[in-house]
Swiss-Prot record:
Protein name from the UniProt record: Entry-fusion complex protein OPG086
Family recorded in the similarity comment: Belongs to the orthopoxvirus OPG086 family.
Species name: Fowlpox virus (strain NVSL)
Ranges of the Virion surface topological domain: 22-103
Alphabetical UniProt keywords: Fusion of virus membrane with host cell membrane, Fusion of virus membrane with host membrane, Late protein, Membrane, Signal-anchor, Transmembrane, Transmembrane helix, Viral envelope protein, Viral penetration into host cytoplasm, Virion, Virus entry into host cell
Lineage: Viruses, Varidnaviria, Bamfordvirae, Nucleocytoviricota, Pokkesviricetes
Length: 103
């Protein structure tokens, strides 16, 4: 019985290591891309949906640029720049769904 528990404990530790330190989740792959070209410095190109009204949305490629000095994120979509101030809670609430819907 003890050998059985020790084997499962070692198996549990190996699985914890694998899921924690290997590239298994989408966030880790997105933050540290291996061969992902769109990243260049602090801007990223992705496809997402932008909600213009309650029932209308537009989908297409967007370019997100983060400016750490002014704490802003500028989203360029079809020639229109949308500026989100990360200090403002309402702007963050508008930006998060766009980032979550990106493919």
């Amino acid at each position: 019985m003890t050998l059985f528990l020790v084997i499962f404990f070692i198996l549990f530790l190996l699985l914890c290591y694998f899921f924690s330190f290997k590239r298994t989740n989408k966030m880790e792959i997105g933050i540290n891309p291996i061969k992902k070209i769109p990243w260049s410095d602090n801007e990223h190109i992705f496809v997402s949906s932008l909600f213009t009204n309650k029932d209308k949305y537009l989908t297409g490629p967007m370019r997100l640029t983060y400016r750490p000095d002014s704490k802003t994120a500028v989203l360029d979509f079809k020639g229109t720049n949308y500026t989100y101030y990360l200090d403002n809670f309402d702007d963050v609430r508008k930006l998060v769904p766009t980032l979550l819907l990106s493919k």
